[in-house]
């Protein structure tokens, strides 16, 4: 099984630094395996680790290409936030999540908080709605199963009444992830210790 490693998060920092500094794209490090996996890239900011962007894909993408694409998409094109600025980069933390072990479930409580992420979709009579939480979200927020599912329904944009009938009608897939988190200072330390050029 491929696990998230520090070079993946270093590469994500390199990618957004190159974009912000209008430099050429960095090469994919040899330590990033040439395999295809679903992935998410998450940016958080400051001591409180406030979310600044989180976007990914459930499609199998070659890791180097996927990390490049979603490092930029989550940093600059998450519609919930303004694009990350050059001035913010030193306060950032990057999280790389490689998604594995997808399993459809038939009971909305059939997943483990802190271990499983959940992806759900349903038809509200007007449109199909979908949303996802990565495995760490429910635990970080202190939510139980019902609260997590209800927040997921709201995240999908649904504003109607939520009850057990709706929860039980959801199509839910649980999954796990291999995650690596890297603060900017550790990114700089990594670059220095490996004799790599520092960002401007």
Curated annotation (Swiss-Prot):
Pfam families: AMMECR1 (PF01871). It comes from the Eukaryota. This is Uncharacterized protein R166.3. NCBIfam families: TIGR00296 family protein (TIGR00296). Gene3D superfamilies: Hypothetical protein ph0010, domain 1 (3.30.700.20). Residues 1-191 form the AMMECR1 domain.
């Amino acid at each position: 099984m491929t696990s998230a490693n520090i070079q993946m998060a270093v590469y994500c920092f390199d990618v957004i630094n190159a974009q912000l500094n209008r430099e050429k794209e960095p090469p994919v490090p040899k330590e990033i395996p040439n395999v295809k996996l679903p992935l998410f890239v998450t940016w958080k900011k400051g001591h409180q680790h406030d979310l600044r962007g989180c976007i990914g894909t459930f499609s199998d993408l070659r890791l180097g290409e996927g990390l490049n694409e979603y490092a930029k998409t989550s940093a600059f094109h998450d519609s919930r936030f303004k694009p990350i600025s050059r001035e913010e980069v030193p306060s950032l933390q990057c999280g790389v999540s490689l998604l594995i072990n997808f399993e459809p479930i038939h009971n909305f409580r059939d997943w483990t908080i802190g271990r499983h992420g959940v992806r759900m979709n349903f038809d509200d009579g007007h449109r199909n709605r979908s949303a996802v939480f990565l495995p760490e979200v429910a635990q970080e927020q202190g939510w139980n199963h019902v609260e997590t599912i209800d927040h997921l329904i709201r995240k999908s944009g649904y504003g109607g009444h939520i009850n057990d009938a709706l929860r039980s009608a959801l199509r839910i897939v649980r999954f796990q992830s291999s995650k690596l988190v890297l603060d900017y200072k550790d990114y700089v330390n990594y670059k220095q210790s490996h004799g790599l050029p520092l960002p401007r």
